[in-house]
Amino acid sequence: MDVISDKIDASLQLALQLPTEELEKSGSLSAGYEKESQSWELILRLAGSVQTLRQAFPQASFQELSGGYVTALVPEDAIEALAAQDSVIYIEQPKRIVTGVAQGVRASCIWPLQQEMTPVGPLSGRGIFVAIIDSGIDYFHPDFRNADGSSRIAWLFADGKEYSKAQIDQALAAEDRTSALSLVPVTDPSGHGTHVAGIAAGNGRASGGRNRGVAYESPLIVVKLGTARSGGFPLTTQLMEAVEYVKRKSIEERKPVAINISFGNNYGSHTGTSLLETYLSQVANQWKMAIAIGTGNEGQEALHQQGRLSAFRQELGIELAVDVYETSVNLQFWKRYQDVVDLVLLAPDQSQVFRFLDSEQGVGEGQIASYVWNNTEIHVFFDAPSPYQIYQEIYFAFLPRTDYVDAGVWTIRLLPRRIKDGSYALWLQTGGSLNENTGFLQASEETTLTVPSTADKVISVGAYDSRRNQYASFSGRGFAWVTGEVKPDLVAPGVDITSCAPGGGYVTRSGTSMATPFVTGSAALIMQWGILEGNDSYAYGEKLKAYLLRGALPLLGEPMPSERTGWGEDVIIRLH
């Protein structure tokens, strides 16, 4: 591309300027790139008809979502022309998302509600969809089958194909597992989705009811993320398509739905303003639904640093340790656009790699600069605010010239020149893609929650240890950067949670991935009580969240609200 468009996000603009061999060194920068066809998966915000784009770009494919959001697969050489279309408001690169990995039921006060009788029986999630958007599911597991052996899964979507309950029942009736998988070829090798589904809605049949989930009679919608095209890594484009699929199925069947998302990443300003976050916030208001999202497990990972610059301080040094054998490091620096700050990058030997002179006239914005130090190439993109982002991002990509990035302590010096607010924040990519000792030497504990749990209209869920009744130290913390919005909204049990495992048994895991489905199941119970049983026809969306927050109780020693635990632990409201 000869011209860089203000409509394209920073990581994509940098990625489009790198040679393919450089691009492939970074899993973050290459997310969404299809080498064989030289095409990119993209997220678009559109004002107008997607049909116009289909006619103008017949070599591309577009999938229309709600509210003017579109996912697309576009040849690289057509992206600049696409961005030039008046109807295209903004384009974002998809990001890789990672998982956040019987006691919990009782700790959340859900057990009494499951026993409490209503005019039509106990609260069990009956008549409310629970949607699991995850790594798949072991649909053979007894906990996802009825007493007659039929499936509790109403719809299963994987690898671009949809399977109905009737098709799953046909597979379950096959003479052996191989024959069944030839009919419905869906598995869950990691077991993550199976475990999450069991917490939210497993019926406990394999344990005689002992390991029963929350909404144990809810019908399930399951969407498996990750495709061969994305190398098996789930992308934010696929997450958005999955949410859209679930919403449309729920509307078709006129059933409320509680959606579980136990995935996240670190890319973004953590202010709820990316296309993924704004999409989730607007779709949450389109139907009788609740969306619960885990805050991730970055609470102790040293992947974030934030602070406030002073006009009276000459400079601030931020030290970043890079471990040995690191194949790539990606760093975002965010600040308010009205603050003028020069940046200096020092190599591990304290030699100056580059100095960026910020300009009050915006000189240098939209530009890419590349530098070399020993075995490391440093590519830097200086972005400007976007139609959806009032903050300024400077994106760093540390890539090896041969095998690994140079280990040692790199230093970013911030030299304030004109400060109106002074807030700044830095994030590294999600911890699962970095070695153990890579991180900031003076890391910040606050605002370590992952995107998209930062979206405004979702229920953001952290984790606590229900045995000790204390915050789980790994759980991603709030509040939202700069805005101060209270996130997480609340916490749920996330330490040593026993739930379903592929093969028919159970396994114990920890993480916000395990906490989130407790809240998803709770949401299904509230919707059953309110919508199906006539107690509150509007018990969904923000009103449902309000019910959960009203019923939340503080953990011992935690203020309310707390950056660690939000408004407290998920103690589902007293319905009678």
Where are these regions (language model features)?
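Extracellular S/T/G-rich loop segment that most often corresponds to the catalytic His/Ser-adjacent loop
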Residues: 157-174, 301-402, 414-415, 439-524
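Autoinhibitory N-terminal propeptides
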Residues: 1-120, 128-129, 142, 562
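C-terminal subdomain of the subtilisin-like protease fold in secreted/lumenal serine endopeptidases
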Residues: 32, 252, 256-265, 283, ...
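Subtilisin-like serine protease catalytic core
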Residues: 117-237, 254, 326-329, 338-339, ...
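Hydrolase catalytic cores
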Residues: 197-200, 221-229, 245-258, 340-342, ...
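Mature extracellular/periplasmic domains of secretome proteins
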Residues: 118-125, 145-147, 211-215, 233-258, ...
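Edge beta-strands of jelly-roll/beta-sandwich modules across compartments, strongly enriched
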Residues: 420-431
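Active-site glycine-centered loops adjacent to acidic/histidine catalytic or metal-binding residues
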Residues: 134, 296, 511
